[in-house]
């Protein structure tokens, strides 16, 4: 008489955690295997994480040659007052907007670069 998979599963379900650990160790020893989980390659996981990025930070790297136009662009993009926008531009590199979607980040970058600023999207 052979034991079915269902009978084995029922027997394991009735065991305590310690008994299951002992069973696994005995199986590893008897069959010369290990019960280690498969490890995902680090490179593949990193590539997927980069592809799944949905929030971006827009960083003002420098104001460039036309500081006044950049301050106006910063005011329009952020809704800051003149004093705050000037302080942000003077303090470059500085985060301009954080946690925005890809389309907004790209549009903001294009707008600021058109005004003469150097911008990074991270």
Curated annotation (Swiss-Prot):
Protein name, as recorded: Large ribosomal subunit protein bL12
An example molecular function term from Gene Ontology annotations: mRNA binding
Keyword Glycosyltransferase included in the entry's annotation: no
Repressor in keyword set: no
Function: Forms part of the ribosomal stalk which helps the ribosome interact with GTP-bound translation factors. Is thus essential for accurate translation.
This protein's UniProt keywords: Ribonucleoprotein, Ribosomal protein
GO biological process: translation
HAMAP family per UniProt: Ribosomal_bL12
Complex and partners: Homodimer. Part of the ribosomal stalk of the 50S ribosomal subunit. Forms a multimeric L10(L12)X complex, where L10 forms an elongated spine to which 2 to 4 L12 dimers bind in a sequential fashion. Binds GTP-bound translation factors.
SUPFAM superfamilies on file: ClpS-like, Ribosomal protein L7/12, oligomerisation (N-terminal) domain
GO CC terms, sorted: cytosolic large ribosomal subunit
Recorded family membership: Belongs to the bacterial ribosomal protein bL12 family.
Superkingdom classification of source: Bacteria
């Amino acid at each position: 008489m052979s034991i079915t998979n269902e009978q084995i599963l029922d027997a394991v379900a009735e065991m305590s955690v310690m008994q299951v650990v002992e069973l696994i160790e005995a199986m590893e020893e008897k069959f010369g295997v290990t019960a280690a989980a498969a490890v995902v390659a680090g490179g593949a996981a990193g590539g997927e994480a980069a592809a799944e990025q949905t929030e971006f930070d827009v960083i003002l790297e420098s104001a460039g040659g036309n500081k006044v136009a950049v301050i106006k662009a910063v005011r329009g993009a952020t809704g800051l007052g003149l004093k705050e926008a000037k302080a942000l531009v003077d303090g470059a590199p500085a985060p301009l907007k954080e946690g925005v979607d890809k389309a907004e980040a790209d549009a903001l970058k294009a707008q600021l670069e058109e005004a003469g600023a150097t911008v990074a999207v991270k």
